[in-house]
Amino acid sequence: MSRRRAHDTEDESYDHRRNKRRRVSENQEIEDRLESLILRVGERSTSSVESNLEGLVSVLEADLGTFRLKILRILSDCAVRMPEKCTVYTTLVGLLNAKNYKFGGEFVDHMVKTFKESLKMCRWDAARYSLRFLADLVNCHVISATSLLQLLDTMIDVSNEDTVPQVRRDWFVFAVLSTLPWVGRDLYEKKESALESLLLRIEVYLNKRSKKHHNALRVWSSDAPHPQEEYLDCLWAQIRKLRQDNWAEKHIPRPYLVFDSILCEALQHNLPAIVPPPHHDNFEYPMPWVVYRMFDYTDCPDGPNLPGAHSIERFLIEEHLHHIIETYHHERKDCAAQLLSFPFKHKIPLEYCIVEVIFAELFHMPTPRYLDICYGSILIELCKLQPATLPQVLAQATEILFMRIDSMNTSCFDRFVNWFSYHLSNFKFTWSWDEWDSCLLLDGEHPRPKFIQEVLQKCLRLSYHQRITEMMPTTYAKLIPLTPVPNYKYANEEAANLPGTAVAHQLVVAIRQKCTPEEVVTILKDIPSSGYSGEEMSDGSFNALKIDVFVQTLLNLGSKSFSHSFAAISKFHSVFRALAETEEAQICILHNIYELWSSHQQMMVVLIDKLLKLQIVDCSAVATWIFSKEMTGEFTKMYLWEILHLTIKKMNKHVIKLNSELSEAKDKLAKADSSSSDSEDDSSHKRKKPITHADKPSEEVVERMEEKLEAANVNQKRLFLIVFQRFIMILSEHLLRSDTDGRDPDTDWYRWTIGRLQQVFLMHHEQVQKYSSTLETLLFTSDLDTHILEVFQQFVALRA
C-alpha cells in the first residue's frame, strides 16, 4: 500500500508540473496573439479601421484582468515605435478608458514614465513620439487639455534656461511645435487663450535665438528658387499657417471622430507635474538642420498638387516618409515597397515627395544618417517597382541638381557625384550627355565640368576605361580620365640619364627572382645619398633617391592589381619601415606613389590606405603631403580629399578604440575591487560569481592604456592642427594676393578650398569638437580674415 501511495504521489507531482507547463505555454500563446492583434490593428484591407478597433477592444477588455501589464507594455511600445499609427492607438486607448477608467489611468502613468525615461536617456525621437501620443489622448478624452497645456508650458520653460546649449532649448521648442498639428484644433476650441499664450512664448524665443549655424548646413549658398529655411523657422511658419486655417489640417487620420459619442462620456485623467531633467555635460542633443526643398507645384504638372512649403501637410508627409526610411533602410526592397505604399499616395504627387525626401537624407548636413549607397540602392529599387514614372522624376531631379550645382555645398557635391556614378553603373551608363555639353565652354574648375569629370572618375572605378570612352560623346574628350597605367620613369627613354636607373634595373631582376627583404636592403646600399633631383624634399635625414628607386620599382612590379600591390608591400614591409623613419621620408614615399600612379586615382587611395594600416606612414605625413606644393595641381580633385578623410577617420577610430578599451578595463578593475570587498562582507554562498584574477587588469596595465590614449589624443590634436593650419595659410595667402592685385577673391578655387575646410569640420565634428578651444586659441583667432573665421564660428554654433 505504501508503495502505491508513493507511486500516486509521484504521478500527482508529475501531473502538477505538466499542467503548470501547459498553463505557461497557453499564457504565452495568448500573449503572442494579443501582441500580434495590437501590432496589426488597422492594417486589414478587408475591413475598416473602426471595425478593427471595436473588435480589438472587446478582446483586450476580456483579457485585461490576466494580461494587464503585457497590454500596457505593448501599447506604450507601439506609441514610440509606430508613430505613423499614433491616432489608431490613441483611439484604442480611448475606447479602453471609456470601458475601464482604472486601466486608462494606469496607461497614462505608464506613458508618462516612458516619456520621462526617454528624456533622461536622451532618446529624443522616442520622447517626441511619447509627447505626441499624450497630446493625441486629449482628442480621445483620456487626458485633460488643461494638464497637457501645463506640460507644454513646462517644456517651453526650458527655452528660458541660462548657461545651457541652444540645441537643448531648440529641441524642447521643436518637440512642442511638432505636437501641435495633432492637438492644436482641440486646444483652440477649448483653451484658445492658453494656446495663444504658449505660441507667443515660442515666438519670443524664436526671434531671439542665434542662427549662426545656418550657412554651414545649407545645401546651396543661394535661396533661388527655393529658400533654405532653418528647421525651426520652417516649422514655425507651417504652424502659423495652420493657425490661420483655424488648425484644420487634411493629412492626419482621426479614427476617434467616429467614436466621439462613446469617448466624450469617458472620465479624463490629469497628467502629473513633469519636470524635464536638468542639462548635463554628457547630454547630446540633436543638431539643427536646414529643410531641403527641390520641387514645388510647378514641377509636378500632372495629378494632385504638391502641398506648399509652409503647409503643415508638407511637414507631416515628409516626417512620415523619413520614418519609413528609418524603419526599413536595412532592406532596400522592403523600403522601396513601403515608400510606394504610402497611405495617402492618391492625394499627393508621391514620386516627387519620395525623391525629394531621399535627396534630403542624402544631402543632410553635417552627415547623412546612413551610407550614400543606402539611398542609391533604394532609388534603384524604386525605379524597378515604378518604371513608368519614377525614372522620369529622378531624371528631372538630376537635371535640377546639375543646373543648381554652381552654388552647391562641397560635401553635397561629393555625395551627388557618388550617387550619380553609382546610379549610372546600374543603368548601363546611359545618360543624355549632349544636353549638358554647354558646360564644356566653362573653365575646368567650374562645378559643372568638374562634376562630369569626377563622375567619370567614379564610373571608371565601377567599370573600365574603354567602356567610359565609348559611352561619352567625342566632345567630352578633355573630361575623360587618362588611361590608368603606371608611369615608371626608370623604363622611359630618358631613364639612362637618371641617377638610380642601374640600381632600379638590378632591383627588378632581384624581386622577380623572389629575393628577400634583406637582399633588397643590400642592393639599395649602393645608391648614393646625393645627386638626386628630388633632394630638395630631403632634409638630409634620409636618402630620397633610395626611396624613389625602391617605391617606384616595387609598386610598378605589383601594378597588375590591388592584390599584387598589397602582396608586394606586405612582403617588403620591413624595408618600407626602415626607409620611412622620419615624416619627411614618409612624404617622399607618398610623392613617389603619386608620381607612379598619377593617372590612377583609385590606386593611390587604396595604396595610401594600406600604408596607413601597416603603419608605414603616419596620418600627419599624409596631411602634410596633401597640402604640399607638389600636389597643387590636384588640390581641387575629389580623390585627394577622400585620402584626407580616410586618414582622419583612421586616427579617429584609433582614439575611439583606445578610449573604449580603457573604459572597459577601468570597469573591470572597479568591479573586481567591489567583488573582493563584497566577498569579505558577504557570508552568503548565493552571490554572483566574482571577476577572476585572470579577467582583472592590473593597475599598471590600466596606466599603460591611459598613456597610450593620451599619446593618441596628442597625435589626433596634432593632425587637426596641421590640417587647419595649412588651410588657413593657403586661404590667407589667396585673400591677401587678391587684395593686393585688386582681384575678386571669390574664384572657383577659393570656393572649393573654403568648402573643403568646412567639410573637415562637419564630417569629423564629434572629434574636432574636443579641440575647439585649442583651435580658437592657436589658429582661429580674432585677427583672422572673417571669411575663414566664419567657418569655424558656424561649426562651434552647431553644438552651442
Curated annotation (Swiss-Prot):
* SMART domains named among the record's database cross-references: MIF4G (SM00543)
SUPFAM superfamilies, per the entry: ARM repeat
**Assembly, per entry:** Component of the nuclear cap-binding complex (CBC), a heterodimer composed of Cbp80 and Cbp20 that interacts with m7GpppG-capped RNA.
Q: Where is the signal peptide?
A: none
Q: Where is this gene product found?
A: Nucleus
The identity of this protein, by name, is Nuclear cap-binding protein subunit 1
Q: Which function does this protein serve? A: Component of the cap-binding complex (CBC), which binds cotranscriptionally to the 5'-cap of pre-mRNAs and is involved in various processes such as pre-mRNA splicing and RNA-mediated gene silencing (RNAi). The CBC complex is involved in miRNA-mediated RNA interference via its interaction with Ars2 and is required for primary microRNAs (miRNAs) processing. Also involved in innate immunity via the short interfering RNAs (siRNAs) processing machinery by restricting the viral RNA production.
Pfam (any one): MIF4G
Q: Where is this region: Disordered?
A: 1-26, 669-700
Q: Which organism is it from?
A: Drosophila erecta (Fruit fly)
| Family per similarity comment | Belongs to the NCBP1 family.
What Gene Ontology molecular function terms does this protein carry? mRNA binding; RNA cap binding
| MIF4G domain location | 31-243
Q: What is a single cellular component term in the Gene Ontology annotation?
A: postsynaptic cytosol
Identify residues that carry Phosphothreonine: T9
Keyword list (alphabetical) reads: mRNA capping, mRNA processing, mRNA splicing, Nucleus, Phosphoprotein, RNA-mediated gene silencing
Q: Which GO terms describe its biological process?
A: 7-methylguanosine mRNA capping; mRNA export from nucleus; negative regulation of viral genome replication; nuclear-transcribed mRNA catabolic process, nonsense-mediated decay; primary miRNA processing; regulatory ncRNA-mediated post-transcriptional gene silencing; RNA splicing; siRNA processing
